[in-house]
Amino acid sequence: MSSLETRKIEPQSSTTVTLGAAGDTVAVPTGGIVKTNTVKDAGGNTLFTSDGAGTLSGVNSAFNGSTIFISSQTISSSTASVEFTSGIDTTYDEYVFYYVNIRGATNNTHFGFNGSIDSGSNYNVQKSSTYFNATHQENGSSGEIQYNTTGNVDQGTGNQPVTTGQGNDADECCSGCLQLFTPGSTLWYKRFMAKSSGNWHVDGEENSRMQGQFATQSAIDAIRWSFASGNIESGTIYLYGIT
């Protein structure tokens, strides 16, 4: 078998290098690596594109159910809020935020979000929601499942809680996810729902479920996260698109 050793192959003309002919198999041996940022099929259709750092874009719609990383923000010093003002548009019908190990500065307060229709100039979109949770104290003294009106928003423009009564001890935090549907639509109201797990302020656990809607036909193009009282001390928030 003949072998060709080279560091670079370039086409004599145009921008296409053809390896083999119809019916041939081009094999990459075990341990071999093919590096590229854009993968296309024989018809020139892009299957996906990478930015060289592992973030994909332009993913072909045939890859149904893919989770596409958009951006993330890590809170390493105390801040009043975290805003996502880009990446929320009509590209995907569903967006998911993951909030991980979010710790607040204030005891017995609520972590939540609000939406914007003007790229983050204002966060005051009218919304309504339902909220229920299960709580249990660490010492086993009490526990309950309840419809929690503290987490409700009744056609209001303030924050929508995803946790209520969160503690702020050094080892207390919350984690969860928020699903946001068709935020770029100018026809529908924008549905959302969240599920969260966190430390309750009386040394207990809270498991919560929330669902609701942004009562606007305008596109939601930014989301802000904050506590009802006090700063965010630490944690990471991720944004993904779902194909």
What function would you assign to each model-found segment?
Residues 25-26, 104:
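Short, surface-exposed beta-strand-loop junctions and turns on beta-sheet-rich folds
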